[in-house]
Amino acid sequence: MFSPNFVLASASPARLKLLQTIGINPIVRPSHFDESKIVSDNPRELVEILAKSKAQTIAPDFPESLILGCDSLLVVRGEIYGKPNSPEEAIARWETMQGHHGTLYTGHTLIDTKQHKTLVRCGITEVYFASLDRPTIEAYVNSGEPLKCAGCFALEGKGGLFVDKIEGCHSNVIGLSLPLLRQILQELGYQIAQFWDSRSTPKNEY
């Protein structure tokens, strides 16, 4: 059975680690797409467009390949949060987030350049944040972790300490829904096992 190259259009270490955890060692090619070009008040629409744009940007360079693009956003109390632009912004966001619940949207696009097919899906997970005092918020932001993450937290890192519970897909919060990836691959006619250990180490193309 033909197994195309699997390409990750992202520089996210968390997404790469998720793929490696399930036995996929992709070619890594960050798209460097300018996300500021896309504006929408609809978070689901926004992450789907951004994920698709990232994958489409690099697709011409990879014939007979599968290109995976993803994008995540957190919505808390009606506000859409991507990555914070500064420590001060991260602190302000956490003061809003703490003690409340948010909705984490992750857009997924898989482009099959051999079959000339593109599938776009969105994973949605509810996240419930712990109540935190100001010193704890400042200490977490000063660790640097929130500045690298959509929504100002990393569930797989220190941020997991401050999440009381989630409803939905755990890996979706980290940046890539593994069950959703399996479903998309099946829709394209592939089985996830085709891509296990297809490469011994990821090939970074920065």
Swiss-Prot record:
Compartment list: Cytoplasm
Species per Swiss-Prot/TrEMBL record: Rippkaea orientalis (strain PCC 8801 / RF-1)
Gene Ontology biological process terms in this record: nucleotide metabolic process
Cofactor(s) essential for the protein: a divalent metal cation
HAMAP family: Maf (MF_00528)
PANTHER family recorded: BIFUNCTIONAL DTTP/UTP PYROPHOSPHATASE/METHYLTRANSFERASE PROTEIN-RELATED (PTHR43213), BIFUNCTIONAL DTTP_UTP PYROPHOSPHATASE_METHYLTRANSFERASE PROTEIN-RELATED (PTHR43213:SF5)
Family to which the UniProt record says this protein belongs: Belongs to the Maf family.
Catalytic site positions: D71
Protein's recorded name: Nucleoside triphosphate pyrophosphatase
